[in-house]
Amino acid sequence: MTDMLFDRTDIDALLAGRHPDPFACLGPHTDAGRVVVRALLPGAQRVRAVTPDGDELGALACVDDAGCFAGTLAHDGRYRLAIDWPDTRQITDDAYAFGTLLDEAALARFAAGDPAAVLDCLGATPTRVDGVDGVRFAVWAPNAQRVSVVGDFNMWDGRRHPMRLRRPWGVWELFVPGIGAGEHYKYELRAADGHVLPHKADPCARATEAPPRTASVVADTAALDAFAWHDDGWLHARPPADQRFRMPWSIYEVHAESWQRVPEDMDRSANWDELAERLIPYVRGMGFTHVEFMPISEYPFGGSWGYQPLAQFAPSARFGPVDGFARFVDRAHAAGIGVIVDWVPAHFPNDAHGLAQFDGSALYEHADPREGMHPDWNTCVFNLGRNEVSAFLIASALAWARRYHVDGIRVDAVASMLYRDYSRNEGEWVPNIHGGRENLESVAFLRALNDTLHGTLAPPGVVTFAEESTAWPGVTASTGDGGLGFDFKWNMGWMHDTLSYVREDPIHRRYHHDRMTFGLVYAFSERFVLPLSHDEVVHGKGSLAVKMPGDAWQRLATLRAYFGFMWAHPGKKLLFMGSEFAQWAEFAHDATPHWDLLDAPAHRGVQRLVRDLNRTYAAEPALHALDCHASGFFWLIGDDRDNSVFAFARRDDSGRLVVAICNFTPVPRPGYRIGLPAPGHWRELMNTDAAVYGGTNAGNDGAVWTEDVPSHGQSWSATLRLPPLATLWLSPA
């Protein structure tokens, strides 16, 4: 009689993991005035239905030795299952006794591309349903035949927790009672062609196992959302759009995995609390205004430096629990330091547990390899023309801003997104609908991203940066004016030109003078950051110090002069870790910066110079207030190529002035006359050749006085001694 309670077709389909709708047969169902309860519990020896108080309601008979049970109840209210396993007894609510979980309106918003709906719907969320505690799982996989959640709680058996498909949105959902934060899980998917895929990590996981393990982890989202922040004052003081461009920005770029390691504990990476103890005081003491982390969302391959992430919502478990990052940001803000994270929407790795062929189809990526594979990195390219993919990525950026209070998002590899033929030969790319090379879907995505992060869904004051290496127009123009809407763009052209200049032997620099001046032709066409990033000190390019020609003294002197030029030049500043003390070695992701070099006075001198440049830059409005406006700069000497001398003035709205003079030869130049834009006493604000920085201490005894001798288009001038390979800053006393 009991075998009539469980249809053989359903049994076979469930045991084979092929049932299209497990809720149609599992759980409670009313049949001819009785309640029939069916359960799939492979390995169970005995199953009974009990009340929440433990009173027996009836036995569920075994109708198939593989673990199918069924029985009838006179009671149509809540019940629990008392399950006898070979070595234990378990009492749990039935996952298939709960109705639909996700709101249809929210699912419709997700399908329409609303990033807030991703945060509302997807991922693993500890919650309470009908008075029962558990975890709600939801994942987008519209082309799968079947999706199950698997984990430690069900022995990673895809038969035990098949999910409900919410048509037509392609989202699968299931509430698993009796589990909570800390559970490890993945999804098991059967593709449309019937084959079972490798277990997939949750694209929207808020936490993960530490690599090389690859499971997702149920995060305590309630605790994260209730985190005791102490940075209200910081957040409210973040400048609005019209003011943030006038602020000093000096950014210290950090690879968190290697900045400092813990040698006494198997040389592991420092966790977030340890980084907070060490990194925040260092950044503050060095005068940087912000720390920028290379990607910290979970990434399987350490050698990618984080630029091939697979858990866009989860801080990497390499650095400890996810709430540790919240504590780091909170402490950084308390110390007056902003936090920027690198973020990668251009591509993702093809690891079997990741997004590639997620439901057996090209779901997150393009199906055509001419669009869907990146030739430089052998990675998959996001299909940004798909609403759900765009919403998924923007939701990730939004989550970093909302959940972790980050101050800025730096978007990686923007140029590769904007051009369909990026790194592709003829015949290897697909034109857009107009026959052109511009990636219109990426343009729309980037505009939507910036509008979202600058809109009401995000906390006020979030700043966006573009790593964009071409001359694409309007990267920092508003979306309303047809631009991409970024706040700042990395000035890759300035970086390449100026580094190529200082790499030249001083005797040859006269022939390349325009490399230092050309950047001012376009310096105000966008709002720029001047980046000396990790990309310039790796892959055989040499560290900044090694790029400089000459002996060790000349190399460090040239680097000091270059830093003085850079910090006076229009544009916000960014410097990669190790460069602040002139490390000789290239960046290596599995080794720390060579901190031992600070035992040498020459390297301590460079470090002290960077500290003083930062402090002076931040304290002197003439050096930052009009970074993004042509009125804040004018040349004094831009054509003295024979002597490799440059001089220019910076000013703010009130007329405050700073003049920078650079001598990029090892020849001291006494009696060098330079026009100055104001009469009187000018003090030496900065001299990169000072002895405390490792220089010769040549200079002007701290001050100069003008004469009524016109020069360089100015009514007054002064005669200076220009130190060798050095930059001077002067300001009116």
Swiss-Prot record:
Enzyme class name: transferase
Gene Ontology terms for molecular function: 1,4-alpha-glucan branching enzyme activity; cation binding; hydrolase activity, hydrolyzing O-glycosyl compounds
Gene3D superfamilies reported for this sequence: Glycosidases, Golgi alpha-mannosidase II, Immunoglobulins
Single Gene Ontology BP annotation: glycogen biosynthetic process
InterPro entries xrefs: A-amylase/branching_C, Branching_enzy, GlgB, GlgB_N, GlgB_N_E_set_prok, Glyco_hydro_13_cat_dom, Glyco_hydro_13_N, Glyco_hydro_b
Cysteine pairings via disulfide bonds: none
Pathway(s) annotated for this protein in UniProt: Glycan biosynthesis; glycogen biosynthesis
GO cellular component, one term: cytosol
One Pfam short name: Alpha-amylase_C
Keywords: Carbohydrate metabolism, Glycogen biosynthesis, Glycogen metabolism, Glycosyltransferase, Transferase
Active-site residues, Swiss-Prot/TrEMBL: 412 (nucleophile), 467 (proton donor)
E.C. code: 2.4.1.18
Reaction(s) catalysed (UniProt annotation): Transfers a segment of a (1->4)-alpha-D-glucan chain to a primary hydroxy group in a similar glucan chain
Function summary: Catalyzes the formation of the alpha-1,6-glucosidic linkages in glycogen by scission of a 1,4-alpha-linked oligosaccharide from growing alpha-1,4-glucan chains and the subsequent attachment of the oligosaccharide to the alpha-1,6 position.
Family, as annotated: Belongs to the glycosyl hydrolase 13 family. GlgB subfamily.
Subunit note: Monomer.
PANTHER family linked: 1,4-ALPHA-GLUCAN-BRANCHING ENZYME
Protein name (Swiss-Prot/TrEMBL): 1,4-alpha-glucan branching enzyme GlgB
Organism: Burkholderia ambifaria (strain ATCC BAA-244 / DSM 16087 / CCUG 44356 / LMG 19182 / AMMD) (Burkholderia cepacia (strain AMMD))
Gene: glgB
